[in-house]
């Protein structure tokens, strides 16, 4: 079911509207003054969490899904059954350097899944296809599902960050990305903008 839910994320727009909600925070990782990767943290809504846990624990409903730490086996199942499919959608991650689209890698590093209270959380590092210098022009990073089946947005109270070698003098902020409207122009996604 969880693999199906995320596979449907790029289904026809006519059937879209959020079925899953995800809060995110992104940290841009610098090396030698350029952004080389993005560390992303995702928190799923409680309904999706129950569905995901029910699938891997073979139970039905919240009353039978114990909110407890995930086992290594469960983390492996989540990665195989739900997370790995997101590579087909660039992990819902969109990057532009000076207005030009930048590719991300198909494989992530440092994948983890965990429980954060009653919510399933993912964390992972997503390399950029090529390092980007935000000093050459603003770097914009958005995490959203183009079909709007999954509503992805910045986590409240958690600001985007920059870190690493050469990140000094750079700052990240959340902006309304009016250049990439969703759901027939009705939804303005949020994006992280880095300027140095």
Language model regions located:
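Early extracytoplasmic/domain-onset interaction patches
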Residues: 17-50
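Surface-exposed, acidic/Ser/Thr-rich flexible loop segments
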Residues: 109-163
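Sec/Tat signal peptide C-region and signal peptidase I cleavage site
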Residues: 11-16
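Glycine-rich, aromatic-bearing surface loops/beta-hairpins
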Residues: 139-143, 147-196
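Short, solvent-exposed beta-strand/turn "edge" segments of beta-rich domains on protein surfaces
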Residues: 28-37, 111-117, 183
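Short structured motifs
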Residues: 22-27, 105-111, 176-180, 190
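Bacterial N-terminal signal peptides
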Residues: 1-9
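Structured domain cores in non-transmembrane regions
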Residues: 47-128
């Amino acid at each position: 079911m969880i693999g199906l839910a995320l596979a449907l994320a790029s289904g026809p727009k006519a059937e879209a509207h959020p079925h899953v909600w995800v809060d995110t925070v992104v940290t841009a990782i610098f090396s030698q003054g350029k952004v080389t990767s993005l560390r992303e943290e995702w928190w799923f809504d409680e309904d999706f969490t129950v569905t995901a846990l029910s699938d891997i624990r073979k139970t039905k409903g919240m009353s039978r899904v114990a909110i407890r730490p995930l086992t290594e086996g469960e983390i492996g199942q989540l990665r195989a059954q739900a997370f790995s499919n997101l590579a087909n959608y660039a992990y819902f991650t969109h990057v532009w350097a000076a207005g030009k689209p930048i590719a991300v890698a198909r494989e992530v590093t440092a994948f983890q899944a965990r429980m954060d209270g009653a919510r399933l959380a993912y964390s992972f590092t997503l390399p950029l296809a090529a390092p980007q210098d935000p000093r050459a022009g603003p770097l914009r990073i958005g995490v959203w599902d183009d079909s709007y089946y999954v509503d992805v947005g910045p986590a409240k109270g958690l600001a985007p960050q920059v870190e690493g070698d050469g990140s000094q003098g750079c700052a990240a902020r959340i902006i309304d990305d009016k250049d990439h409207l969703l759901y027939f122009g009705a939804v303005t996604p949020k994006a992280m903008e880095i300027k140095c």
